[in-house]
A protein has these predicted regions:
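A residue-level marker of the well-folded mature domains of exported/periplasmic proteins
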Residues: 21-222
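Bacterial N-terminal signal peptides that target proteins for export
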Residues: 2-12
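Bacterial N-terminal signal peptides
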Residues: 11-19
């Protein structure tokens, strides 16, 4: 996590320096607005917000605006559209779901530099993407389980939000390995939407009814 946060801070600083250099060529000191659209609120994302605030402190003519959508796609779309209407100088987005893509596209098409963080969109209309290789994460987990589980083992896959790119890519990577390993199999997939409460809910529901036994639980969360 710290590596991704530092990379994001460095990327923001580099973009700021580029904008400041362009500004200094004509002798004027412009006021820059950086907008951040967070899909949700948690300790991890608050740490990210803190890192961005630190980066912004290096420049007294930089204003940082942070909004959280609390896992509401409609709200995040509205927040991104408002940022675009305000013609912010830089937009950083952690998309809640891939369905948020049109709003990001609209901002990018207005000429606003866009950094996508943590989760991908459906298009390539962004300036930079910072995130994990989620397909490789799923592949690595599949290969590890295939090497340590006994033949005939059954796996319960606890997935993240079905419309978020990390869940989609981790599932693709994991399932691609299992498909080639006849010694292990996935008996069921549950979707917990990246929340602790959701994970408890779906697993408790499974265990309260007759279910096919499993030897291992693979959860998408990191």
């Amino acid at each position: 996590m710290n590596k991704k946060l530092n990379i994001l801070r460095l990327t923001v600083l580099l973009l700021l320096l580029a904008m400041l250099a362009a500004c200094s060529s004509n002798g004027r000191k412009k006021h820059f607005v950086i907008a951040v659209s967070q899909c949700s609120e948690d300790v991890w994302r608050e740490k990210l917000n803190e890192e961005l605030r630190i980066a912004a402190l290096y420049h007294n003519n930089v204003e940082l605006r942070i909004k959280s959508a609390n896992d509401d796609v409609k709200l995040q779309t509205e927040q991104i559209d408002r940022f675009a209407d305000d013609n912010v100088d830089l937009l950083i987005v952690a998309p809640g779901q891939v369905t948020i893509s049109p709003a990001i596209d609209r901002a990018y098409e207005k000429g606003i530099p866009v950094i996508i963080f943590d989760r991908r969109t459906r298009s390539d209309k962004y300036t930079a993407y910072i995130g994990a290789d989620n397909k490789e994460i799923g592949t690595s987990m599949g290969e590890h389980l295939a090497s340590v589980l006994p033949n005939g083992s059954n796996i319960l896959e606890l997935c993240g939000l079905s419309t978020s790119s990390p869940a989609i890519e981790r599932q693709q990577g994991f399932d691609s390995v299992v498909a080639l390993r006849p010694t292990i199999s996935i008996v069921q997939k549950l979707h917990a939407d990246w929340t602790e409460q959701g994970a408890y809910r779906v697993v408790d529901s499974l265990l309260s009814h007759p279910y096919k036994s499993f030897d291992c639980l693979f959860a998408h969360n990191d």
